[in-house]
Structure formats: structure tokens, C-alpha cells
Amino acid sequence: MSFTWNQVRDVVDTVLELPAPSRHRHGVVFWLFLCGLTQVAAQPWQNSPSQPHPTSSETGGWAAKGLGAPVARDPIFVYNDWSAYDELSDNIPLTEQLAMKELDEILRLRKFGVRFDYYMMDAWFDPDGGYRTWRKPYWPDGPDQWIKKCRENGILPGLWFGTNLLEKINPAPQWQDSLNANKGAMSFSEGGFLPHFMETLQYWYDHGIRMYKFDFADLDAATPETEKTKSKEQIRSANVDAFRRALKKFREKNPDVVLAAFNGFGGDVESTSGPFPFRNPVDLRWLEVFDSLYSGDPRASDVPEMNFWRSMDIYSDHMVRRYEQSFLPLERIDSTGFMLGNTGTIYYRKTSAWKGAFLLMMARGGWVNTVHGNLEFLTDEDARWFAKVQALYLGLESIGRTKTFGGIPGDVQPYGFGALDMEGAVYVVVNPAQAVNEIQMPQLSQVQKANSNGRLLFRDAGFEPKVTGDKIRLGPGQMALVGYGRYASPAYDMGVQTDVRIPRSIQPVDATFSPAEKNTIQAMIVPPARGDLRIILQQKGSDGNIRRSWPGGPPSGISMGKALTLHVSQGGKDIPVEIAYDKIIWSGLSWGVGEVRRGSFNLGQPLTIRCASAEKDSVALVGRVYEVEY
């Protein structure tokens, strides 16, 4: 038996509006909503555990091959085990035991209605196998059991490839005549690398692989002979054309594959303060062969926030906007913004502020929705919440549209993502500024009804946003979810994110900073009559542009709390400063934010604030101070 989306929504709305005793009597119906959404018509991704994905002819339902689009036919959900393991900035290897444990976690989450279509295996290969063999110490019998269990449970397996860069892999004999001068990468347009690489992709397709992730591409690689005779532009053009043609042929032969592009295919993802348009532009012809292009691994933006994880949200939001401005459709951008894990690559986040990160990933409108990391960190109750958000947005992505609005996140302007269908709209709105701001939630289409009677569905703790008509008032650094039309219903309430706390008020404090010694600024202020102090340090280079400090990644790097320091004293006595950025951060950081609690200083005596950078060459530091009340 199957249901339409509208039938499911009607059931949910009806059950949730019943009195409590009736809700209990109708609990089976509500459980079907939470756990049985995979039976909704037009969503045949989940089948009997022992059955593979059916074809259209077998079910009479939806099948990708029945559509005309050559790529990106429908939203999908991907699990990737990167950040559950980490061998680059940590020492946790990718073992068969770890991978199979996460597969069991996928099956656990499915019981609560969570959808996964693909399992992407990250760096799996033996360094001497030319992408044909798995690492023996960790995969003694190869991948067969993993592939078999995935497919038995209706999950399609995928593999990560370092493309033509020799990242933790040695050149196979067939690649030797494609190597560049430093023997770190292979040309796509010369020698035997590309033919052998494409044969390898086909080899894995024939073994059941259906998704391929291409990372670390070096499109400027050329043999020493070619480097002497051709320009960099000619070399790059030849590589792009050769690889794109090869992927086209591969897709034509295997039309059900999903191909995802990561590092190396365009865009500047190091920070949110870089120039735009991108210095490394995105070649839109890649959309002919890739289902998605990613917009950067999670990292802090150059927007200072007391909550470190919110600055990371802003980074992913900013990069999606920049890729959209580079003319990529939102559905083709993989924001890669949601990672769980206790590893260096995700800054030992575990599940901190995970709900806001997940909501934002869904709200950005990408059709390749990737979840990374330790799924066991999600409780059963978390899984129910996850499934509820997923069901809301997968319906809107599949049937409706997603659009951006407001300012550019990295420019510290309020912004958001809106999704609509003919029955209503939902808006995720973010205020990145150190001020209370109001932002309009515009109509997303001419056929959309005017926004009125909106409902606040989700928010951070602390400041209580106020929705008035088509506007919302947000606290500093706050995000919220608002529903209109059908979605302005208790059925879509998502609760409060308690591990992100927003001040109920914020006011600037008069503070004049002046140089004290090298890479140090100092100010003396009169303590405010009430509230805590928030101190913000921003680092710039001698050219006036935002500059990140890079004191090394884990495990041997220096903590950012030592690289960018905030110090407060009163009468010669040190005052504690609470910070959340004291982490070893592989991606660098350009700011520091800290707070001093009101009870730790005397009101009648001035405070001395010192902000410093450990950079060896001269930098420019900017300091700001605010009074905040929680």
C-alpha cells in the first residue's frame, strides 16, 4: 500500500491536532508517519531488506531511467564514513569493522524513517593497487561482504577516488607515462592513466558500485615534455576535455551511476573573505557529467561568532551562495555541511549544534544530501527528529523549489533559504551580525500566496524570535525556521536547539583599541552597568584583507586559543575569558570571540582588554566589545 505526500501530511496534521487520549489511540497512525514514509508514492528507495532496488517495470512506479534528464534526476541521500575515521588530521583508520558498524547504524536509523540511498566508502584502496585492490590490513577479504550487505538492504555502494593526484597511492605501471615532473599527479590527456582509470571505474561498476566521488583533481598536470611546449591554459583545456569526454562515455554505458565532484573542479573554498568572482572559476560544462559539485569541507567562516559551530554554518551557507552566483543550480551543489564525529577533520565536534547544521544542509536545496561521520552518535530520539526534517525537505525538494534571499553570509548580512510548493513555504533564516536584526521572508514565486500567519518552527535557545507577517526579528548569530500555509502547523514544530544560546540583548561598548606591542592591541573600558562582556578580535594582513592563522592541524598543531588570544584584567588581576574556538583547526581561523561574565569583575573599576596574534610577521588587529545579556 502506498500514500501520496498530501495523504501523509493530512494524516499527520489530523493526528497531532487530536486531544492527548486520541493521539495515544491513533499512535499506530503516527508511527507510520515517522517510520513508514518510505512507502509514500514516488519514493521507492526502500524495499524489503533482501531485495535490491526494483525497476519501473517491476513496480509500475518511479524509476530514474524513465526520465529524460541525463544527470541529477531526483534528490538522494548519501552516507559517507569520512569523519567517523580520519587518517589525515587524526589516527583513526578506515577498517572493515568500522565501515560495517556504520552500515548497521544506517539500518537502525531506517527503522525510525531515516532515508539513505547510497553508502560512499572513503579512501579504501591499497597504495599499490591502482584503485583495484583494498588495503589488506583493514580489509583482508576485500569489499564483497560490504557490497553484498548494502545491496541486500536496498543501499547502493559508492567509492571515493583521489582522481589523478597521488594522494596516499603510488602510480600503477599503466600510469607511468602520464606522470608530471614531480611524480605527484598524472595527465588526463597523455599516456595510459586515463584509459586505465576508466577501465577501473567500469571494473567497480561491474562489481556493484553505483556512485563515484572524484576528489583532489589536478587539471594542470602534464608530462615534462608537454610542460615545455604548451601553455598552462592549453594543458588545462586538454585535461578537462579528455576527462569530460571519458566520463560522458562512462555515463552513456552506465546511465544509472551518480558522479560527484569535489576538490579540484573549480571554486575558491578556503575562506569566505576571498574575492568574487572566483579566481578559480567553475567550468559549467562539468554539469554535463557530474550530478553535483561540492562547495567546500566544513570550516569556520571569517564571520566571528561566539558559537564556533554557527560560524561553520555560515561558511557553508556562504559557499552555496557563491556557487549559485557562479550559475550552478542549487540542486547541483553539495554543501557537504553536515558532519558528525570525534576526529580532527570535524574539530572533535561529536554532535554539537547538529540540529541547526542538518536543517541548514536540507534548506540549501542540494539534491545530493551527504551525511558524514558517526551515526551511532544519534540516539533513537535524534533519529525521529532527523526523519521528520528529512521528510519535510525531501518533499519540498522533490516537488517544490528552493530559493535564496537576503544578503551574502560572509558579508555579515541577514539571509536565508526558502522552499515552497503549492500548499505553503518554509524559510530558514540566519542573522550573522552582532546585532538584533529584522529580515523579510519574501514571496519565492509569483504564484505563492502572500506570507501571513507564519509559525516559528525551530530556533536557537535564548533570544525569542518574533514573526510578524513576512518578517522575523532575530538575535545576534541566530537561526530560525518559519512555516507558512500548510507548514504553519504544530505538525512541523522542530523544537529549540538548546546547545546554541543567543543573547536576549546586545549593545556595543565604547572601546578604543590602540597598538600595545607587536601584533597586540589594547583598550581600557568602563564596565557596563549590567550584562556580560563579549570581545571580538578580527585579524587582517598588511594589505587590509582578512587573514587566517594556520598554526597546524591535529594531532600536532597549536590550539587557536594560543594563536589568537584574548586577555582581560582589572587592577592587575586576570579575569577569566570564556572562549569556544580553543581548538586545533586544520583550516585556519581569522578571529577570536570570548565572553567575560558579569560576576567576575567589579563595576566601579576599569577593565583592560588585550588582543594578540602569535603570527611572526606583522598583522593588523581589530577589536570590538559588546554588552550582552542572556
Predicted regions and their residues:
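Active-site-proximal substrate-binding groove within the catalytic cores of carbohydrate-active enzymes
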Residues: N80, F243-K466, K471-G485
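Bacterial N-terminal signal peptides
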Residues: V28-Q39
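C-terminal beta-sandwich/jelly-roll accessory domains of carbohydrate-active enzymes
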Residues: T402-Q413, M422-E423, V429-Y630
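Conserved structural scaffold segments of CAZyme catalytic domains across common CAZy folds
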Residues: Q43-K168, W367-G410, A419-A425, P432-N437, ...
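Hydrophobic alpha-helical scaffolding
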Residues: I92, E96, K136, E190, ...
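N-terminal secretory signal peptides that target proteins for export/translocation
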Residues: M1-H24
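Aromatic- and carboxylate-enriched substrate-binding clefts and catalytic-loop regions
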Residues: R115-F338
